[in-house]
Amino acid sequence: MKFKSEKDVFVEALSAAGRVVGRTLGATQGILLALTGNQLTVTGTDLDITTRVTLDVIGFDDGAVLIPARLLVDAVRTLDAGAVTLETKGDKVDVSLGRTNYQLNTYSLVDFPKLPPVAAPTATLTALDFVEGLSQVVRATSSDEARPLLTGVLFTTEDEIGRAHV
């Protein structure tokens, strides 16, 4: 697998997936990178929550690799601005930009948990509508961790009407 991506876009995707990776099980401590054409899918999971981010890259060789999340995120963050190149070489991966090069070990792909396929989106919101709806209800949430049910926001949709309810 080999691709190029702008550092800032890549770091944003890695950070999103890296926030949910597991802390105890080996393979769930990794971020799965899967390249098909010019589409890179970045996946992180702790078996309860999964985050998938898809971004456009310049793809050279399709493939997939499972890399320790913390090492990958830290390595890419330290690079200067520009186009980051990631290339697999056996059980290692090279992350480079300019004269800086990191070589990281990888996990076996067979150890990564099989995730259910992502269903088609049930609703699409603009960022403005999402933020507006969220800002109307988030003040009603509790910060008391003793009652975790009240610390979140539930999103539902009504398909017939096409509105999202927060």
Q: Where do the language-model regions lie?
A:
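Structural preference for solvent-exposed beta-strand-turn elements
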Residues: 1-163
